[in-house]
Amino acid sequence: MKKSVVAKIIAGSTLVIGSSAFAADDATSQAKAAFDSLTAQATEMSGYAWALVVLVVGATVGIKLFKKFVSRAS
């Protein structure tokens, strides 16, 4: 009687451990997919940021040159 109870407990714990390991694999793959998506979004946003940096620097240089030419013309 005692051996069958111990065998059932061992079988049940093996089933629980096996299913939790499977769930952990799924969670790991979901986390990896989330970080891959985040990396792709960050790369895309940095591309937009560089275009904005070029625009701001170009506008700043243009304004300074305009001020320089206006002050010399007057």
Swiss-Prot record:
Protein name, as recorded: Capsid protein G8P
Protein family: Belongs to the inovirus capsid protein family.
Top-level taxon of origin: Viruses
Alphabetic keyword roster: Capsid protein, Helical capsid protein, Host membrane, Membrane, Signal, Transmembrane, Transmembrane helix, Virion
Species assigned in the record: Escherichia phage If1 (Bacteriophage If1)
Residues that span the membrane, as ranges: 46-66
Subcellular location: Virion; Host membrane
Ranges in the topological domain labelled Cytoplasmic: 67-74
GO cellular component, one term: host cell membrane
Gene3D superfamilies cross-referenced by the UniProt entry: 1.20.5.80
Membrane disposition: Single-pass type I membrane protein
Spans within the Periplasmic topological domain: 24-45
Cited function: Self assembles to form a helical capsid wrapping up the viral genomic DNA. The capsid displays a filamentous structure with a length of 760-1950 nm and a width of 6-8 nm. The virion assembly and budding take place at the host inner membrane.
Pfam families in UniProt: Phage_coatGP8
Subunit structure: Homomultimerizes. There are several thousands of this protein in the phage capsid.
Gene assigned in the entry: VIII
Cleaved signal peptide residues: 1-23
InterPro entries documented for this protein: G8P, Phage_M13_G8P_capsid_dom_sf
